[in-house]
């Protein structure tokens, strides 16, 4: 049996501050309405563009208009009241992607949808990539803090959009990354780097699936210093999602090695995992409380935060 809660459990709302003119955004959710015409209806946005695979490693122009009109690999949507609307070739708007959008005025854009599937970035080697990352709103890391431990990016030039032009980030230690922002960065060689905290899951295609045998998330500190990591569990208001952390008990008299739940409640909760030392990796196991499950399948979100200001969102599906 599937319920509205099962569908709502993976959803959240992303708030994006849109400026007049060109904006470089990173969309973190898969919109409930992914048709560009319907999603953008009623907003002052008149152009949306995203870059799929570049066919060359050519340098980009500092002018967004040139990128859209002359470079290969762009899909562009244009509002129907524009004279060039017939050139639109943009089927859907999906999460986990960087976009250039043009707005006639500034406004606050609320986009609701399912958290996009967690995955590592598919970097194009020896090329500039238009990318974005999940970071804390108003408290993100500096570009240096985020990229200094990636050999493919630590010395790479970064360009962010300011007043409609791409501007080189000259002081990486002083400029902070922003939630919902995308930027250009050069990838020197092959890489799958996605931030100072790496997450791994066996069932990463569908998110974290917690079934009869449980599930787990591996956390790896890729930096040369400690990282303070915390975790939050998000469920729709008034709903429950019975999953718990699992702990290993090794000194029980009758069952010397067994798994027991660390009861954190049935709804929303937060838990300070631990301080991860430099290069340390840990496994965070979960078990579902089948007796408390109201449906055969229930969904929620896990958010992992670091004291650097990075965060990772993961879809969770518990199966009875």
Where are these regions (language model features)?
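N-terminal exported-region signature
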Residues: 4-197
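Short, hydrophobic/aromatic beta-strand segments
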Residues: 110-112, 195-196, 225-233, 243
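Terminal connector regions
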Residues: 157-162, 275-320
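Intrinsically disordered, low-complexity Pro/Gly/Ser/Thr-rich segments with frequent PxxP/GP/PP motifs
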Residues: 240-293, 311
